[in-house]
């Protein structure tokens, strides 16, 4: 990268790709969930994720750029693990706990990425872009908190007890 702005835009392209991939993965995770609340959480986050793509388009626009995608190996690895979890845990009491674990891996990656991008946008003097990235960051943190709540109140308990929740 030649400049900080180049690094920033390259990283935004990485996250734009990541969000596109999550739009494809979240319906599979929702379908695999046997707990109604977890199913709903994945569906709600799908709508937010589609919104994140639009918000990232606004970030590109703030820099006078058209949206671009750059292959994000990190999210592809996380999604591959999620698909493996679904395959290995179908009809198992652990399916919902495993899906939460996979979902939180994605959320934590996004939280780290959007926090860094927000800080870079501030440093580049792009307050509007920083504000948009902060909105996305808040939504990712809320999604992570929802998954934690579901894990602690039912899904991990069901997995430990050997009960398939919701079936």
Place the predicted regions along the sequence by residue.
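Amphipathic alpha-helical hairpins
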Residues: 1-167
């Amino acid at each position: 990268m030649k400049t900080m702005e180049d690094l920033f835009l390259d990283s935004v392209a990485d996250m734009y790709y990541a969000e596109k991939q999550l739009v494809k993965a979240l319906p599979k995770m929702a379908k695999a969930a046997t707990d109604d609340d977890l199913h709903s959480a994945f569906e709600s986050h799908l709508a937010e994720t589609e919104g994140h793509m639009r918000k990232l388009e606004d970030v590109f626009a703030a820099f006078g750029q058209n949206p671009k995608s750059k292959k994000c190996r990190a999210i592809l690895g996380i999604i591959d693990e999620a698909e493996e979890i679904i395959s290995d845990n179908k009809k198992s009491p652990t399916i919902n706990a495993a899906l939460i674990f996979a979902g939180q891996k994605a959320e934590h990656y996004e939280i780290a990425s959007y926090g860094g991008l927000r800080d870079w946008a501030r440093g580049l003097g792009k307050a509007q872009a920083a504000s948009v990235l902060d909105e996305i960051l808040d939504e990712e943190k809320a999604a992570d908190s929802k998954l934690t709540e579901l894990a602690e109140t039912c899904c991990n308990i069901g997995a430990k007890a050997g009960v398939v929740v919701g079936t």
